[in-house]
Amino acid sequence: MQKFSRDSFNVNEAINELMYESGVIVIENAYNLNDIKEAREIVNHFADTEEQKETHFNAEAEALKQIKLQQRIWNLFGKGDIFSKLISDDIIFSLMSKLLGSEFFCGSYCASRLLPGSLGQELHIDYPYWDFYNSETFPMGLNSSFAQNCQATIPLDIFSEVSG
């Protein structure tokens, strides 16, 4: 995993790390804390006031009656202008354009709120082939010579077992 700061970000080094090395990069301090605080407040508001919308791949949490400790907030574009600001950051756009091509699009934009004690999600990969265990469902010749998907995670809180 390669780490960058906003000032040290290099799109070519990032692409190399994503495609040929670990597949993961971290960009530290990419956003200002006021924007993160605003986004967190909106996510928490909707998580507290909307009907429960669970995440996928959470059979264990459901079986243990802990499903209420995790919630998905969908359609962030419609929840506040701050979410458009965050996702349209130059670093994200330069990286996604180079990795996926200039006509890439956002297939989903949501927040996953995990409260302390949450089990999180079962291991999976997202679209286009989430079930990495059933190779017979893959098209012939599937390989990683080009990217089909990329995910950006914007943490609104510090990740830890205690925080969820």
Language-model segments: residues:
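Double-stranded beta-helix
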Residues: 145-153, 158-164
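Non-heme Fe(II)-dependent double-stranded beta-helix
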Residues: 1-22, 27-142
